[in-house]
Amino acid sequence: MNREITFFGRFEADILADRKTITIRDSSESDFRSGEVLRVCRNEDGVFFCHIKVKSVTPVTLDGLSERHAEQENMSLDELKKVIKAIYPGLDRFYVIEFTRC
């Protein structure tokens, strides 16, 4: 049985179109392994919409986020930092989970 990861519904279309290829999470959601296949569901209602395969899990700080991270999230760097600050207020250490849709 595959473990599950959730995304806000606003990211579903980008994931399904392969425009979003990373997710940035805090330490409570950093225990995924390279090669692991995850069920992907919407955070708001738990509806399943695809599977992803984890490519890597890499630590990063808020200041360490780059234009490349923003590109992989399909947004600008300023937008990315605002989203991360809104989801994880007061935190500075995160994990970049790179994935491919399967």
From Swiss-Prot:
| Catalytic activity field | N(4)-acetylcytidine + H2O = cytidine + acetate + H(+); N(4)-acetyl-2'-deoxycytidine + H2O = 2'-deoxycytidine + acetate + H(+); N(4)-acetylcytosine + H2O = cytosine + acetate + H(+)
The record's listing under InterPro entries reads:
AC4CH, ASCH_domain, PUA-like_sf
- Domain (ASCH) spans 6-92
- Give GO cellular component annotations, separated by semicolons: cytosol
**One Pfam family in the UniProt entry:** ASCH
Repressor recorded as keyword: no
**Which Enzyme Commission number(s) are on file for it?**
3.5.1.135
Q: What GO molecular function terms would the record report?
A: hydrolase activity, acting on carbon-nitrogen (but not peptide) bonds, in linear amidines; N4-acetylcytidine amidohydrolase activity
The portions of this protein that span the membrane are none
Cite the entry's keywords alphabetically. Answer: Hydrolase
Name of protein: N(4)-acetylcytidine amidohydrolase
User: Could you name the active-site residues?
Assistant: K20 (proton acceptor), T23 (nucleophile), E73 (proton donor)
Quote the function comment for this protein: Catalyzes the hydrolysis of N(4)-acetylcytidine (ac4C).
Q: Which domain of life is it from?
A: Bacteria
Q: Which family does it belong to?
A: Belongs to the N(4)-acetylcytidine amidohydrolase family.
